[in-house]
Amino acid sequence: MSGFQTSDEVDISNSLKAFPVDIATDNQKDKHENVGENVSDEDDGNYIASKLLESNRRTKGKKGNGKASNFQSMGLNQTLLRAIFKKGFKAPTPIQRKTIPLLLEGRDVVGMARTGSGKTAAFVIPMIEHLKSTLANSNTRALILSPNRELALQTVKVVKDFSKGTDLRSVAIVGGVSLEEQFSLLSGKPDIVVATPGRFLHLKVEMKLELSSIEYVVFDEADRLFEMGFAAQLTEILHALPTSRQTLLFSATLPRTLVDFAKAGLQDPVLVRLDVESKVSADLQSAFFSVKTAEREAALLCILQDIIKLPLKDNVRPREIGNVNNPKKRKRALELALKGSESGSPDSTLVFVPTKHHVEYVSELLVQAGYSVSKIYGSLDQEARLNEINNFRLGKTNLLVVTDVASRGIDIPLLANVINYDFPPQPKVFVHRVGRTARAGRTGWAYSLVRAEDAGYLLDLQLFLNRPLVTSSKQVKTDSDCDFTKQIVLGSLPQELVAELLEWVQRIVSRDVELQQLSNVAARGEKLYFRTRATCSAESAKRAKELVDSKGWSSNNPLFGDVSVIEAEEKYAELLSKVSSYRPSETVFEIGQRGHLKTEAAEIMRKRRNKVKPKGIKSEVASDKITDSSPGNMSEASESELEEVFKNPKELSKKKTTDFKDKEYYMSHYAPKESIQETGYAINSGENFTTAARHAILDLTNDEGIEQSRKGGQRWDPKKKKFVNIINDEDGSKGSPKIIRGESGVKLPATYRSGRFDEWKASKAFGANDSPIRENKRYKHNKLQTPKPADKFRDNYHKQNKRNREAKERGIGIKVNSELKSAVEIRKARELKEKRLAKNNRPSKKHR
């Protein structure tokens, strides 16, 4: 460890600490500085560890940057550094640079990072550094909870790679494995347990595990843990953990339920998130298309066919994965192919839809159109989910249809295009969607379909991004005059293209019964989705009416062609508008009723028409211009600005007038400068988790179309032949399966405590405090066995035969009859003895 220091290096370990050291730690240091004071062995160990950590630091660059630029500057031990470099890590990722120093200081951390950003190593490396080695007679000291078995097995593999060179033992506790095998694993007192919440809680209740020795807890993919319904299990596990633990929580997004859980389970947590993840890339180009609800499918096909020009299934060229026929090399070849697919294909496109029913419908429609499509939604099976993602990453498919919930944390390559089939109800959801493209200096496109009912959400997004809204083609001459990276360019799609594709969609849906059923189910699911969708602001709702009534809403988007084409489209649209809005000058009652043929009914209709006509003309005239689309600056003007604009004709008094506002207590009714932009982008420094999490909360609507918290009602019970409340199935009341109450008060199924562990323990030859795994961790085979019989058809027949003769000479492998009688033999001997006594009918000679 001393080899990391040189005479030219300066120890700046104190400046590396982003936050003040705990008062208890300072008191311990003061105690150690006093020579004459008695110190316990545990304090000595902590003091030595802190000194080694400080002496092991090596930093480059400026002091006090608050984060480490390489792994050597983090104060890690040499064994762990060798394991890190052997695994191929050269430099820490951004999430690792921000998280590892905080974890080494013992802080509780809430990290927001997507899958593939290095978050697993961000919490495994500090864990290995914290545990260092196995302690004598110690129980489990680290617990990692993952949402599914695949992620748990992947995490335990990473833990074993980083713990090479140490004697730390790690096990995976997941479903689908026999309980007896996991009884043995947990009875061996492993140092690190990587588990899924359901199976771990089952074993905790069954084995009556004591979790007081846990020092390090990680909730990996925490948003997916809550999404999959593990809230009750997590609450029960959290209640059993000691308060002195260090808790980590990693998530791709930050739902409100997760924030409440973090407040209850973490002590003064630090929110770590990457600023680049919360902003729209400067290289992102976006276009917005006004469509009707019935034309959305045709508009989607128009974007794919005429704008992106996505190749059809026959022209897709997947990435080669090597020798797939060899099963031993197939997995390795697949890993290499997936690793090399990070750049993505130039045509890779992500389509966001509101519900899982839309995923099924839209993906099937795109397949009918000839595209290669992958689909993912929240309740999709994990194996099918991985297959769909791998097909997309390998280039076998170039379209991925997903929901907001299903796309969280998915490790997908850099995308070229993102299409919002439904407009996101929140600006943060829009940023979450389009953040998949325009990464690593590459350009990307985001296309959004906006219906009349979505106009308010579009204006909310415009205020959030602080960009001007360009709607009418008269504002721009060609697409070169538009800046798609700095403006919100809104317009419709060419009507002839949409009409042709709409006719094709209607014909395909009418012919295919399955597609027609999927369309009906998606329409019903969207109605439920609208009930749970957030509403736009009141001001945006008012402006949305003006936007929809303007001519710019129906004019073509400047993305299509030059100005002549746009003008031709406008004339065509104007002609259609005139035809559709044509009103005859006379009603049916007035035709031929003039002069001497005039009737009383015709006169009544003429008077009525003259009275109603001015109102109709006024309502049909659309406004050609919209109110200022840029967000108004409602900040209070400064004194210098007022003096420049308004000149006083004369000084009222030589004495300067005093301001009525007290700078310390006055609260202005004006919004602060750039308040809208700051509300969207401002990220707290992290000193207060509640304040920082308030800006990072992202609640996504469930892709099932219904809200989880509102699940209720009744269901038909076939056994009781009547309707029963669904809530009874969850709390175990009124005839539902028997339950037990956990330590935290959570109701758990009674099957969690079935007595199988007691039966297993009784069948083993060790007690409750004994371990079936040897404590010295070194194993040596002492059993003497006979060599395998010689095979005369092998080349080593004579050599193997010689070994067999030598073994027999030493007495190895010779069967010796056991002198111990079995229970059956003992019983038979007793019966024979009783028969002899009865036959002789006289006592033995000893009793004469």
Curated annotation (Swiss-Prot):
Domain (Helicase C-terminal) ranges: 330-480
Compositionally biased residues, Polar residues: 628-637
Listed name of the protein: ATP-dependent RNA helicase dbp10
Ligand binding (ATP): A113, R114, T115, G116, S117, G118, K119, T120
Top-rank lineage group of the source organism: Eukaryota
InterPro entries linked to this entry: DBP10_C, DDX54/DBP10_DEAD-box_helicase, DEAD/DEAH_box_helicase_dom, DEAD_box_RNA_helicase, Helicase_ATP-bd, Helicase_C-like, P-loop_NTPase, RNA-helicase_DEAD-box_CS
Short sequence motif DEAD box: positions: 220-223
Residues spanned by motif Q motif: 69-97
Composition bias type Basic and acidic residues, residue spans: 617-627, 789-812
Species name: Schizosaccharomyces pombe (strain 972 / ATCC 24843)
Residues where Phosphoserine is found: S638, S733, S736
Domains: entry comment: The Q motif is unique to and characteristic of the DEAD box family of RNA helicases and controls ATP binding and hydrolysis.
Subcellular location: Nucleus, Nucleolus
GO MF annotations in UniProt: ATP binding; ATP hydrolysis activity; RNA binding; RNA helicase activity
Domain Helicase ATP-binding: 100-272
Its biological purpose: ATP-binding RNA helicase involved in the biogenesis of 60S ribosomal subunits and is required for the normal formation of 25S and 5.8S rRNAs.
Keywords: ATP-binding, Helicase, Hydrolase, Nucleotide-binding, Nucleus, Phosphoprotein, Ribosome biogenesis, RNA-binding, rRNA processing
E.C. number(s) listed in UniProt: 3.6.4.13
Record-stated family: Belongs to the DEAD box helicase family. DDX54/DBP10 subfamily.
Catalytic activity of the protein: ATP + H2O = ADP + phosphate + H(+)
Region (Disordered), start-end ranges: 22-43, 610-650, 768-813
A GO biological process held by the record: rRNA processing
CDD domains named in the record: DEADc_DDX54, SF2_C_DEAD
Enzyme class: hydrolase
